[in-house]
Structure formats: structure tokens, C-alpha cells
């Protein structure tokens, strides 16, 4: 330790000029601080055309100017930038012209998180170039998972927070913890093994979670082995490492990144009450659409039924209606008979204590009479319906074109299917179709003559 540096330089009596003072101060500084290490953060980085590098090294309380000349700057491997934490080695010197002291550097290395940040950026760029972060590799999360694997430490607030969210929002989900170290030398290998085991278990989704910490504490989630294990998983993975401001390589590779472990649980545990409301809403919409569809189909069916004009279809409709009336009449008869019987039983029960024999006999007679009249009325009604149906069938048969053809007439049709009503509609050699009562003939016109038809009244 120098007790009296001024005595060493012979400055106890001498009066110096400014130039002399700065020169001797430079010698003193370079002698005492000739090879020192200093740690701080780069700011005001400048790279002039000379190839030298100039920047300010600072911490929370002070700053010092630094110079890294071209020959030494070429040996620095990492890219220097503002905000980078570094350790520098060099000597303290004084720029005599301004009286400013500075560090003349020969070595610059990343310091603390700075080195880790450089490694982080390098791995991030490498995996991004390989496509591990692309959206095409992401697997969508299941809407309603039933079994979820949690890869995290078995102790601490993380696992408790995740379980609490699922108990509140989706208690039916089965949670399985795959315990692993989340910090330290063994953490990387354990996390890789846990991911492989969990992916083989057939879970609906996985949560990779850890609480907050420094970049060094979270570093196992920035290891390439962990990133590739996450990418190899078939099961959808939610990465929830650190606090909201923390970002890890596993966040980029995972299918979904959650800001916190609790947020990861909420992504996979939709609120049961919300689901119930959605189900109720969908049920109401389904019922309304079914009703609308039934109404439209019924209207369409009615419209089609009104457009039907074929005699056979009309007959089938009448026959079906007759069968329906028959069944309705039978059911009405049975209901009436059952009603009468039930009423008689009730009356017998109410009057049983008084033995109303005469009234009971009258009621039985009336019941027998009704039972005898109802079948007769039913038969007469059916007979009338059959007669009415027979009459309608005869009427339809008389006006049916098929009946006319059956009496020996035919209908001539041209090649467009148009009926020939006059010889003037034909030409010699034209081919026509003759529709008969049974079958069809192909004929050819030999000649055509227009002969007026004269109707005469017979005396």
C-alpha cells in the first residue's frame, strides 16, 4: 500500500503545471491499477470507423469510460451491446488532454446474467432456425381435459396454487404430479425424464411449472435437452415457468405459454358454471331450431300433398283417411265404454251401502243399450264411408284419361310429347307415338287431310 504517493513522485514542495500534473497522475494510475478486473453494465456503446470500441461501464452508483482498441476488440467473441453485463480487464489510464481517466481494456467477458443471456439468445436463435417455435408444430389444448399431468416440484406454492384452481373450477379433473427438481445440477436430466414418462402415460395435457427466480435459478428450463424433450412430446404442454415477466426457452417450444402456474391451470380448467350456461344455451338453441325445422317440414309436406293430383294417390289418401277414421271411431267407442264402466263402478261404490238395486238395474240397462247401439252406429258409419268412397272412385274413373283409352281411343304425341289435336299439326313422314289403353305404338304419317267435323241432330 502506498502511504504517501506524492512523496514518491517528489511533489511535496514542487509547483506543477496542469500538463505535468496530468502526466504524473497517468503514470501513478497505470502503475497502481495496471491489471484489474471491473464488473458493470455497458452503455453509450460507440464503434467508429477506426475499429476501436468505446463505451461507458456503469453500476448503480458510478460510471467510468472504457476504450477497447481494434486489436483487442477483434478477440472479443460475444456481441457487445448496451445493457450487457460484463467483466473487463485492463489498466486505468488518464487522457491528459482533458484530465479524464479511463480504462484501457484488453479483455471483455459476459458477467453473471450477461453470459447466461448470451447463451439464451444463441440457443433461441438456433432452435428458431430449426422451426421448433413455429405455429405449425403447436398442438391445440383439449377443451375438456379429464386427466392432467403436472411436472413440477412436489413442494412449494406452485403445486398448491395449481391444485387450488382445479378444485375451484374443475374438481372432476384428475391431477397427477410427476415430481422433479426445478433448480440445480440434476434438474435438467430429471425434467427430461419426467417429460418422457408423462408423455407415455396418455394424459390429456401436461403442465410444466416452476415459481419465479433469477435467470440462473430458471436456467434448467433454458437447456437444449429440456427444449427438445418438450418438442418431442405428443401430449399438449402448457409451460408456466417463473413470473409473468420471465421468459424461458421451454415457453417458446411448448404448445401454450402461461404467465404463471395459476394461469396455466385456468387455461385447462374452464369454469364449471360457465360450461353449464353454455350447455343450457346450446340446448335452448337446439330446441328452437328443431321446432323451426319441424314447422318448415310440416308446411312443405302440406304443400306437396296439395300439389298431388294423381287419382291413385287420391284413392290412397282416402283409404288412409278411412282407416284413420275407423281407428278413431274404435278408440272413441272403447273410451266411451271404459268411461261408462268406470262411472258405474264409482256409482256402485258410492251407493253400495244403500243397495240401490233399481237404479243400478236402470244404469245397467242403459249401458247395455249404449253398448248395443254403438257397434251398430259404427257399422252404419263405416258403410256410409265405404259407399261414399266407392262413388268417388267411380267418378274419378269416368273422368280419367286412362278410362277413355281403355274404350279403344288413343292419344297421338309428337317427339316433344305434345298431344296432336289436328291433322294440321303433322306432316307426311313424321313419326308419332300412339298411346293406347295398354301400351304404346310408333307410327308414321303417310298423308294428312283436314276434314271438318259436322255435328247433326237426329230427328
From Swiss-Prot:
Localization (cell): Cytoplasm
Keywords: Cytoplasm, Exonuclease, Hydrolase, Nuclease
Pfam family of the protein (one): Exonuc_VII_L
EC number(s) recorded for this UniProt protein: 3.1.11.6
GO cellular component, one term: cytoplasm
UniProt GO BP: DNA catabolic process
Catalytic activity: Exonucleolytic cleavage in either 5'- to 3'- or 3'- to 5'-direction to yield nucleoside 5'-phosphates
GO molecular function: exodeoxyribonuclease VII activity; nucleic acid binding
Assembly and interaction partners: Heterooligomer composed of large and small subunits.
Family of this protein: Belongs to the XseA family.
Job description of the protein: Bidirectionally degrades single-stranded DNA into large acid-insoluble oligonucleotides, which are then degraded further into small acid-soluble oligonucleotides.
Protein name: Exodeoxyribonuclease 7 large subunit
Gene for this chain: xseA
